[in-house]
Amino acid sequence: MKERLIGFLKTYFLFVCIFMLQKPLFMFFYQTLYEGASWTEWFRVIWHGLPLDLSLAGYLTAVPGLLFIGSAWGLSNLLRRIWCGYFIFVSVLLSVIFTVDLGLYEYWGFRLDATPLFYFFSSPKDAVASVSVWMVVGGILAMGVYAAVLYGIFHRLLLRKAVFGRMKVPSVSYTHLRAHETKANLV
């Protein structure tokens, strides 16, 4: 039980750390916009984004929380595959969002929200008109690399068999129950 709780908290705080690190990466990528900013301003950006990071980490930790609960009844290979599949999905999702956000900010001048998605789905030709082929290829490569890095982090800290195997399933055998029953009858 303790290992599951530690794993759940580790998953949550890992998501929070990833989101917190994305802000300075974005600022570093657009360092010309932030060249006059002091270190305290960089930390203020992280601080002001923390409530959103905490809530999004909570949303993304809901499925692992259910998987941790399910692991109390058994650690099957199916559960492990679901676990790995979820983190592959999250790695790809986070890499697509972060990479598209980096790429579109240069052209549109604001961070990714529902507006670019609406614009893309209403007129896809106009949405990608200012983007070169090399930018698309580079973006896809960056997404792949970032997704692989994220999954590597998730695998190293959460998904390896050594880490996954620490969640012991409580086993209750028939002989253990009989011995406990006998002790209770003697008292």
Sequence positions of predicted segments:
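N-terminal signal-anchor transmembrane alpha helix
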Residues: 14-21
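Conserved small/polar residues in nucleotide/adenosyl-binding loops
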Residues: 175-184
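Hydrophobic cores of alpha-helical transmembrane segments in multi-pass inner/ER membrane proteins
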Residues: 56-67, 140-154
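Alpha-helical transmembrane segments and their helix-start/interface "positive-inside/aromatic belt" motifs
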Residues: 2-13, 80-89
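Membrane-interfacial interhelical loops
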Residues: 22-52, 83-143
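Membrane-interface helix-boundary motifs at transmembrane edges
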Residues: 73-82, 160-168
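Cytosolic-side transmembrane helix boundary signature
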Residues: 145-173
